[in-house]
Every structure is written in C-alpha cells, then in structure tokens.
Design a protein with these regions (language model features):
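Strongly charged
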Residues: 1-57, 61-131
Length: 131
C-alpha cells in the first residue's frame, strides 16, 4: 500500500527569510470524510466472521459509548489505537469561587494515536502523483 501525494511550492520561513521550496503534500484524491462506517464494516466483515450489519451496529454503539464516557469526565483508550480525551476551558475569573460549572466548557475533543500504531503507519511508502 502507498499514500498518494502531490508536489507543491510553499513558502519556507524557518531561516527568517521567505524562500520558496517544493514539498510533498497530501493529495486531493483523499476523499473528504474518508472511509465511512459502511465501507469500513464491509472491509472488516471480509477479515472476520462477523456480518457487515453487526459491525456497523458495533461502530455506531462505539461512537455513542465514547461520547457518553467523555461527557462523564472519563478518557477512553482503544487499545492499539489510542486515547480519546477532552480539554476544558473557561474565561479567567478574579477568584476561584467565580469559576462555576456554567463558565467551564469542553474546548476540544482530541485523539492521540498509540505510539506503535503511529510507528507502523509511518512505515507506509508514499507514491507521487504527476503534475
């Protein structure tokens, strides 16, 4: 397998001076939204003894369960994939007593790939798409 890329000219400002250099970047061939549940389920069904419908149901429930657990203040780690976590934020207040639940909110939900998962994925070769 290989990941398609294109070559684009971009500004390099690392030296303090603007310099145009060429870079390999993600191709627009990667569909926006990527592989959806149905396609993922079909692929997984071919590799396991489970039916596509069962896998789609599990994927759907997985999303709901992760959302529920994150909403309860838990982080969720899918072994081999990585953890899902939330970050909280609030506006600055003059005293600790002013930092009330109504002023604190989730600023983002993030995922950090498992190090082994990342290492293996980084071994994937890339394939240049001509101009």
């Amino acid at each position: 397998m290989s990941i398609p890329y294109v070559v684009r000219k971009k500004a390099d400002l690392t030296s303090g001076k603007r310099k145009e250099l060429w870079y390999g970047v993600s191709s627009k061939m990667q569909r926006k939204g990527g592989v959806k549940n149905k396609e993922l389920a079909v692929r997984m069904a071919k590799m396991t003894g489970f039916h596509r419908g069962q896998i789609e149901g599990i994927l759907s429930e997985l999303v709901e369960s992760i959302q529920e657990l994150l909403s309860s203040g838990h982080s969720v780690t899918i072994e081999g994939l990585g953890p899902f976590q939330t970050a909280l934020t609030s506006q600055g207040c003059e005293s600790p007593e002013q930092v009330t639940p109504g002023k604190v909110s989730i600023s983002r939900v993030y995922f950090v790939a498992n190090s082994k998962f990342s290492r293996e994925l980084k071994k994937t070769e890339c394939m240049r798409i001509p101009f």
